[in-house]
Amino acid sequence: MCIRDRVYGSWSGGIFLIEIDEETGYPIYPEADEENHVDSYYGKKLLGGYHNSIEGPHIMYDETSGYYYLFLSYGNLQAKGGYQMRLFRCDTVDGIYTDAAGKDMYLFVEHKDHGLKMMGNYTFPSLTQTYMAPGGQTAFEDEDGKLYLVYHQRFAKTGELHEPRVHQLFRTKDGWLVAAPFATDGETLKEDGYSGDEIQGTFYLVNHGTDISDKVHKPQGIQLNADGTVTGEELEGTWEAEEGTPYIEVTLGENIYTGVVLAMTDEAGNDTMCFSAKSDNNETIWGVKYLLP
């Protein structure tokens, strides 16, 4: 018998995993095991329930990191419903899945504080529209070895019109995944990284936060200075690029964000230098520097 796992579920009961007989397509019902959150009909509970707005689960195994990544959509599926993408991980397919803060979601909790928020509502100076309600995601590794995130994107002032989008995913040094700020356009991560001189300059920073709301996360201007400091009107901190690698660490206040630096083209055709990084507080930040011709 060939067996596969299926992840499914939504708001009311939560997210479950059940084995599927690949030959018949029928579920293989397990024995109930209350201590390990196994229901004889629904299968193994991974997280959620209690009418928390969690749906659209997808699990991707990444052989490079050795983790199973659980992608989820939070919020209501409308442009102003706070729809967004979150991420958990585990080294086994059936859990326990934890977020970047090391927290799981078996019990009733305020779900906005759980799960690494990969992206929500945002805009950048070069974008002609404000991007709203990303979600309904799946992820995969392509034949070229790159990881991709596929999802649907809504916009401000266009009702419920939506479009499919594909962004490249990158592994952080500590084994999490972060998405490129812009739709993929053939960009490739430079494995030996960039020098400090190449990176430093004026960036537009978007912090996706952890809220579930119609708030649009707007860019703030910051400066990545040659002396390793970060300065801005409302933010200050430090930054450091790890020599010979694509990794970057940005500290803003008490929060440390780890991620990658890459060069890519935005949706308007501008060449940019970007960073995408996550923190143990479940926030993701994007920084974009527009490169002059």
Name each model-derived stretch.
Residues M1-P293:
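Carbohydrate-active catalytic/glycan-binding domains of CAZyme proteins
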